[in-house]
Design a protein with these regions (language model features):
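Short, acidic/polar
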Residues: 41-58, 108-125, 180-192, 247-259
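Secretory targeting and sorting signals
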Residues: 2-22
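Aromatic-lined carbohydrate-recognition surfaces of secreted/lumenal glycan-active proteins
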Residues: 36-41, 96-108, 151-186, 232-245
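Active-site groove signature of glycoside hydrolases
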Residues: 62-72, 118-148, 268
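Aromatic-lined substrate-binding rim segments of carbohydrate-active enzymes
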Residues: 66-102, 142-169
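Substrate-binding surface in catalytic domains of secreted glycosidases
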Residues: 129, 133-229
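Substrate-binding cleft of secreted/luminal carbohydrate-active enzymes
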Residues: 196, 201-210, 225, 229-289
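Boundary/entry segment of secreted carbohydrate-active catalytic domains
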Residues: 22-62, 67-69, 103, 243
């Protein structure tokens, strides 16, 4: 136990800048309204960046969330040239772009480097991302205490160095933690809320909650628990999905739960490649935001 504590302290000292304080909250408008998602496995989206951007724009999407890398990627930015062209194509259509990285918390220096890569990335036209986010879902590091320590240290670095760039936390939904209490006991909702500008819960139901009522109940409770945990002053963007694993009724249930919650400012389905006409139709009543 003593060695574990010392390791946790050492990790904090390595990762957190001395004297770093949480920066003032940035404008979270980038996370509002209709969004869609592109991950590192969506190579077809990059093959014709202009055509993909046009399709996204035709759906009224305000923000595209793009994964720059995860802890298993072979590069700090996956396919940087193609990504840059795609981001420029989106921005040419006045679509905002938020980058996200999935840290593993096993190699802190790797996570720091790849987090910083989001901030330093520039497109061929010189554009930066409009926002950045950490995808907090890896459970590879079995020590929950050390995982929490490293999450907070990484988030402090991101908050400190992001400046005016808005920062979001992408997380398992609160209901997911409630159903699986061993995943991440005592998740640091309060501490993280001081370090981010918005929360993005992955309220994915897929085939696990069949039917309208089950889907609605899971999403509604997830949003209600999250709002209780993080307070009323921080925006929430609800991400549902996976889109092609949901029926029309389940897609409607997600949208209805988001609308009924009353304080959610953004919404999306994961991901663009799997969202068909039924998915876009379900989101339509929420509007572009």
């Amino acid at each position: 136990m003593r060695r574990l504590v010392l390791a946790a302290v050492a990790a904090t000292l390595v990762l957190a800048p001395i004297g770093a304080q949480a920066a003032p909250r940035a404008d979270a408008e980038v996370f509002a309204g209709l969004g869609t998602w592109i991950d590192v496995y969506d190579a077809p989206a990059y093959s014709r960046p202009g055509a993909t951007a046009a399709k996204i724009a035709a759906r009224g999407v305000r923000t595209v969330y793009v994964e720059t890398a995860n802890d298993r990627s072979t590069a700090d930015i996956v396919k940087p040239t193609q990504l840059g062209l795609f981001v420029d194509a989106l921005k040419d259509r006045d679509i905002r772009v938020v980058a996200w990285y999935l840290p593993g918390f096993v190699k802190p220096s790797l996570d720091v480097r790849r987090t910083r890569a989001m901030l330093s990335f520039r497109t061929p036209k010189g554009a930066a991302f409009d926002g950045v986010a950490l995808d907090i879902e890896s459970l590879s590091l079995k020590s929950v205490g050390l995982r929490t320590t490293r999450l907070l240290a990484l988030s402090r670095i991101l908050r400190s160095e992001a400046g005016e760039t808005p920062v979001a936390a992408i997380t398992y939904p609160s209901r997911g933690f409630e159903r699986h209490p061993t995943w991440w006991p005592s998740f640091p909702w309060t501490e993280m809320t001081t370090l981010v500008d918005a929360w993005i819960p992955m309220t994915y139901t897929g085939t696990s909650f069949p039917g309208y009522d089950a889907t609605y109940g899971y999403v509604a409770r997830s949003l209600r628990l999250l709002r209780t945990a993080v307070g009323t002053d921080i925006p929430i963007h609800a991400a549902g999905g996976v889109a092609n694993r949901m029926t029309a009724d389940e897609l409607k249930a997600f949208a209805d739960a988001v609308a009924d919650e009353g304080t959610v400012t953004g919404w999306s389905l994961y991901d663009f490649q799997t969202t068909g006409p039924k998915g876009w139709a379900a989101l339509a009543p929420l509007g572009p935001g």
